[in-house]
């Protein structure tokens, strides 16, 4: 059974309030996502962020005291779980426990008829009496009635409307409020449920939503006197909470996944959250919530197969898009995750998700009623997303330039392709360099100069290097620009001229909270970080290709993991300046010890008895300590309990503090185990791992020769020499030619030292010349050892011999075959 993030509490004080209940189970910084309290039954439910938090809460609060009551805490059982077996009755009560002798309990609002009343069998020797038929002509009966009618209280009985005659006594009861002659068809006879009728948990799951949605005012069925607290709770519990609207009842008419949801009760009070706030559904979100045109599970499944979208309700108000994506990504690839936020940036308690394949959406739909972050999530099919597609007929009437602009703006939000995140337009680079040199762009770009392309390339290289240094000084991970994954909170803003940071902040704050805006002194590129992904997407869609001052904004989604720290820079803080390196710093190779790329540490070889609290106690004395956590898994033999996996993670504020902690704690003994501390590295995709392996090989075999690819065919050898000689002394430069003496599109540049080659590689790897981005790499080292050359020649010769032998074997299959005798004598 999958561990739940909800706990069940029994034996609560009868006068405890909801605020006290929440405060008690939020002790020691525990994050409570849901609270359901039933003071009359002394029970309650508490939801936590994760199953590990719930397991720790059970271990901490079980058999503890609230006031003078010792509470019992356990993991909440699933909805589809079978009812617990009652304790075996004693011998004295064996007769009463017999189902045949047990009294039948009729459902409420049941009209009792003579046929429904069970007949009591008399003893064999008892005299038989006729009680069903009374003879009103019997003189003794009339005498008895007359005598009884002479009693002084007869008038009082008549005044009160009490029955005084046999007809009145035996007359059937008429419901109050009905006059003679009125129809009482609305009062239906409800047949009593027989005890030998068996119902599975799945059938109860189907019947409960119908009863809850069709007759909400109907009282719960009575429970026998010997019922336990669990039986009483189940009789009062709606299987799917009060989340099912009448129009959405059809979507809930199916059993939830077995063993994956916790028992709860319908909430009749205000939502129990730390930031209690109603679910405000804006018009644009309510239109896309759930489809209400279908009323049966088959229609719901067919709708999911068409749209692959789901609507999630009853989510925690602290849930994020990453939490929803991580929880539902196990069913398939998620294309879209949308969690609406209120004006304060908090979740509204519902979300929309869309899968790549309908089968994945159907698998996720089957988890309706399961527990997610301590709350029972309700899943409904969602209608297709409304997209404002461009009308080709109306678009054709616009000018061509306007058509292209509208198409670019429509494709900007969904396009993830970009060939170089640090690419800057030549006009912006030339403007920045002209302002720095104090000249006009016409003077900078001399038409009589043959090396104008080289000047632009050098200017772009200078601006890019300054931007990299500025971003690195302000907490930006420069290596993140090489990744293909796009983030959801950052935007790269380009094509900006004569713009300040305050103007950019004012421009983007119209769509949400801006955490920080970074723009290098050149003013050619800027990074804008938002607090919420929804705000970032809105700003990107509104501002892409929009006019700002005298130019058009070019926006790109920032790469994932762009910032090395998650601490937001205050709005009034000024970015740090750029420290310009000296010539000696550029020529010196950094041989210092490799620094950590993360502020988290990986701790292995932990004792299985070591808990997160024990790991915290071992590291909390170190400077910059944030948190420590031991990785756990669910115990298959003991549901609801967790087991340590023997390793954990420790987070620090900065990389330097993590580096110092690694040196101090590596090799220390914790709970009789010598722990091993290393830097924590996140899993990379195959492309990134292959890229890092290639870089490691290149770093190990760095030489003095560079290969320059994607070279424009129009560029000359003189221009290439001018470009590379600015970063070191060139020993040789070779541009291979075709038979017509034109360039083949690549070149080889050899420097005098490896340091100069490395400086040229780092400086020119993002440079463009004549509109082409230079792809620079270290050339493969030449074999100097004669033995290596001989071995390579032998290998090449063996390959040629094997190829010839293979051709001989496969070529004989086409030999001509003669059938019959062609040398027949002529007649």
Curated annotation (Swiss-Prot):
It comes from Neurospora crassa (strain ATCC 24698 / 74-OR23-1A / CBS 708.71 / DSM 1257 / FGSC 987). GO terms for molecular function: RNA binding; rRNA primary transcript binding. Residues 277-288 have a biased composition (Basic and acidic residues). The keyword RNA-binding applies. This is Multiple RNA-binding domain-containing protein 1. Disulfide bonds: none annotated. The gene is mrd-1. Residues 208-225, 256-270 have a biased composition (Low complexity). The keyword Ribonucleoprotein applies. Residues 77-116, 176-230, 256-299 are annotated as: Disordered.
């Amino acid at each position: 059974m999958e561990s739940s993030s909800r706990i069940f509490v029994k034996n609560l004080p009868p006068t405890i309030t909801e605020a006290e209940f929440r405060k008690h189970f939020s002790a020691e910084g525990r994050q409570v996502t849901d609270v359901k309290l039933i003071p009359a039954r002394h029970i309650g439910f508490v939801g936590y962020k994760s199953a590990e938090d719930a397991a720790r809460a059970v271990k901490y609060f079980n058999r503890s005291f609230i006031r003078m009551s010792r509470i019992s805490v356990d993991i909440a059982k699933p909805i589809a779980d079978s009812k617990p077996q009652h304790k075996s009755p004693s011998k004295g009560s064996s007769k009463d426990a017999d189902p045949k002798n047990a009294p039948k309990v009729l459902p409420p609002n049941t009209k009792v008829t003579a046929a429904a009343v069970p007949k009591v069998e008399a003893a064999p020797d008892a005299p038989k009496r006729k009680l069903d038929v009374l003879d009103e002509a019997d003189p003794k009966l009339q005498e008895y009635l007359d005598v009884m009618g002479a009693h002084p209280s007869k008038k009082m009985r008549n005044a009160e409307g009490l029955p005084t005659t046999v007809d009145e006594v035996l007359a059937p009861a008429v419901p109050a409020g009905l006059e003679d002659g009125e129809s009482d068809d609305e009062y239906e006879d409800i047949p009593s449920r027989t005890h030998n009728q068996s119902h599975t948990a799945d059938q109860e799951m189907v019947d409960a939503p119908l009863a809850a949605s069709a007759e909400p005012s109907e009282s719960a069925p009575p429970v026998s006197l010997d019922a336990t607290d669990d039986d009483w709770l189940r009789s009062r519990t709606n299987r799917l909470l009060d989340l099912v609207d009448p129009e959405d009842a059809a979507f809930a008419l199916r059993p939830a996944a077995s063993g994956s949801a916790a028992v709860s009760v319908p909430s009749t009070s205000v939502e129990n959250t730390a930031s209690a706030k109603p679910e405000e559904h804006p018009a644009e979100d309510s239109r896309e919530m759930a489809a209400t045109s279908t009323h049966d599970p088959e229609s719901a499944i067919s709708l999911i197969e068409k749209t692959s979208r789901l609507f999630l309700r009853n989510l925690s108000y602290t849930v994020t898009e990453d939490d929803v994506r991580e929880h539902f990504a196990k069913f398939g690839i998620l294309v879209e995750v949308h969690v609406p936020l209120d004006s304060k940036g908090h979740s509204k308690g519902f979300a929309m998700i869309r899968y790549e394949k309908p089968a994945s959406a159907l698998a996720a739909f089957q988890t309706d009623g399961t527990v997610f972050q301590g709350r029972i999530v309700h899943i409904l099919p969602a209608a297709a997303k409304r997209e404002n597609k461009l009308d080709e007929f109306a678009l054709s009437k616009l000018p061509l330039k306007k058509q292209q602009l509208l198409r670019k703006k429509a494709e900007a939000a969904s396009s993830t392709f970009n060939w170089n995140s640090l690419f800057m337009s030549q006009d912006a680079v030339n403007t920045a360099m002209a302002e720095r040199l104090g000249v006009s762009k016409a003077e900078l770009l001399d038409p009589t100069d043959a090396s104008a392309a080289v000047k632009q390339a050098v200017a772009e290289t200078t601006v890019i290097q300054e931007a990299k240094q500025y971003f690195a000084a302000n907490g930006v991970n420069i290596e993140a620009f090489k990744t293909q994954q796009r983030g959801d909170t950052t935007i790269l803003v380009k094509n900006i001229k004569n713009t300040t940071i305050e103007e950019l902040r004012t421009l983007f704050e119209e769509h949400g909270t801006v955490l920080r805006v970074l723009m290098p002194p050149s003013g050619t590129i800027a990074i804008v970080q938002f607090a919420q992904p929804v705000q970032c997407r809105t700003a990107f869609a509104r501002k892409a290709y929009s006019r700002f001052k005298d130019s058009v904004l070019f926006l790109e989604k920032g790469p994932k993991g762009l910032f090395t720290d998650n601490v937001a820079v205050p709005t009034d803080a000024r970015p740090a300046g750029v420290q310009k390196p000296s010539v000696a710093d550029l020529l010196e190779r950094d041989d210092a010890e490799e620094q950590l790329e993360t502020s988290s540490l990986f701790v292995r070889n932990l004792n299985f008895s070591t808990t997160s609290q024990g790991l915290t106690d071992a590291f909390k004395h170190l400077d910059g300590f944030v948190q420590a956590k031991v990785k756990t898994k669910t115990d298959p033999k003991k549901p609801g309990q967790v087991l340590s996996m023997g390793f954990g993670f420790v987070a620090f504020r900065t990389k330097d503090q993590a580096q110092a902690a690694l040196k101090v704690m590596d090799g220390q003994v914790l709970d009789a185990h010598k722990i091993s501390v290393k830097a924590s590295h996140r899993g990379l995709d195959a492309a990134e791992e292959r890229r890092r392996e290639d870089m490691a090989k290149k770093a190990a075999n760095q030489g003095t020769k560079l290969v320059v690819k994607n070279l424009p065919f129009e560029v000359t050898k003189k221009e290439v020499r001018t470009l590379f000689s600015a970063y070191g002394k060139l020993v040789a430069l070779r541009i291979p030619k075709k038979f017509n003496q034109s360039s083949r599109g690549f070149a080889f540049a050899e420097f005098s030292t490896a340091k100069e080659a490395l400086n040229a590689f780092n400086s020119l790897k993002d440079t463009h010349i004549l509109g082409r981005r230079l792809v620079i790499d270290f050339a493969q080292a030449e074999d100097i050892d004669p033995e290596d050359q001989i071995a390579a020649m032998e290998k090449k010769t063996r390959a040629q011999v094997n190829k010839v032998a293979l051709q001989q074997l496969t070529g004989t299959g086409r030999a001509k075959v003669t059938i019959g005798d062609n040398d027949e004598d002529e007649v």
